[in-house]
Amino acid sequence: MDRPNILLIMTDEHAPMYSSTYGHPLLQTPYMDQLAQEGATFDNAYCNSPLCLPSRMSFMTGRYINQIGAYDNASPLPSDTVTWAHMLRAVGYDVTLSGKQHFCGPDQLHGFNTQLARDLHAELWTKNGMLRGTADWSKGTPAAAKPWGGVAEAGPGTTTEIEVDDLVEERSIEYLRDPTCKEKPWVLNASFIAPHFPLIVPERYFDLYPLDQIDMPEIPEGHLENQHPVHQRMRSMFGAADFPEEQ
């Protein structure tokens, strides 16, 4: 049996309920719908960590986060840790990454042959292997220099993240159209930042959803007062504790 080519498309912080594929009445995700109709969907699939990097490292290795020491977004994966990229290369695949996989530290491939488009998170690391802007919680709750933008900055526009995602798409298509792709089986991991914050999108997409048609989340009485202390400290760190109620 011929070995199949594999195109792995990833989006970031994309909850399934925010897609027409999983029944959202307003959002339009036609290409996801097409993939689902022509393939299979899964209703009981879970990531192994609520944090970005640990979840991705578990996905890359097939191991629990406690087995690989990935507990936060500043945990480099040891270069000698085997990933599925290593395993597929070992059986003759060309294994290519285009975009984000949230590797931190000097090794930005972890088994991939090459990376076609940049990962912004790789640029957060200093030359001595430290994450820029890492908070020292041992000295108490760090204070934000300014309130985190979050929803307050949401709207139409462009960002570096959008430009990088456009490059991920462009380089991925170039790779797939390259005749040399037919020389050996390939795996292409096209990994996008969106819909991860900043919550800014090109105007043509923003205009698809009139604000008066978007339901606001239901917030129970006493929600802020009854938050877990960890959540309260996070609100303080992001400078969100003093937001007025309408925000």
Where are these regions (language model features)?
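Formylglycine-dependent sulfatase
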Residues: 1-247
